[in-house]
Amino acid sequence: MSLTIIKGTILSAPTLGQLDALPGGYLVAEDGLIRGVYGSLPEQYAGAPVEDWGDALILQSFADLHLHAPQYPMLGMGMDLPLLDWLNAYAFPTEARFADTGYAREIYSRLARELIANGTTRVCMFSSLHTDATLILMEELEKAGVTGYVGKVNMDRNAAPGLLEETTEESRRETLRWLDACQDFRLVKPMLTPRFTPSCTDELMAFLGKLAAERDLPVQSH
């Protein structure tokens, strides 16, 4: 059993609108699961190593429920444009670069480290349509200790050059290849991700719906 004991000012929000602070409190975790928060260390943990953070605040991490990983290099750009113009001018060209796995590794390793550095440990994340880049993203998140869901985007119509799977069959094939390749991840799991209605044919949506039901997979979209 692995045991972690952290001492500091423990913040918790047991109910909506309630914030509790426990100065000099102890947070005890066994095998990665929090077992309790205590004003004094329980006797069964006496003598165990304690990470003492003094008066530092110990609080829950953040969860980002909608994050487009391949848009990380263009944060804050083009905010003067309406959505579709912004997609065509900034988002789609940036996402197309993730066909390059070397570029994907560079960007996604930085993104994973920055998430952890800023206290975000759980995500629901869009990748691009590139299977290999999506697997790299999952690898980097897992390496950094981020937990959550990642989706290989599906797009088989109405997309910019370089961001369109040539056929619906290719989209199906790459989705299955991705799912087969990511079965061994421990912290990061797959989530089916049709980008949005304009970019997915009815045939593709029917396939993804059937796949979600057969494999009990979650789905995210817009």
What do these predicted ranges mean?
Residues 17-18, 127-128, 162-163:
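Short, solvent-exposed loop/turn segments at secondary-structure boundaries
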Residues 8, 27, 32, 55, ...:
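Divalent metal-coordination and catalytic microenvironments
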Residues 132-221:
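Metal-coordinating catalytic core of metallo-dependent amide/deamination hydrolases
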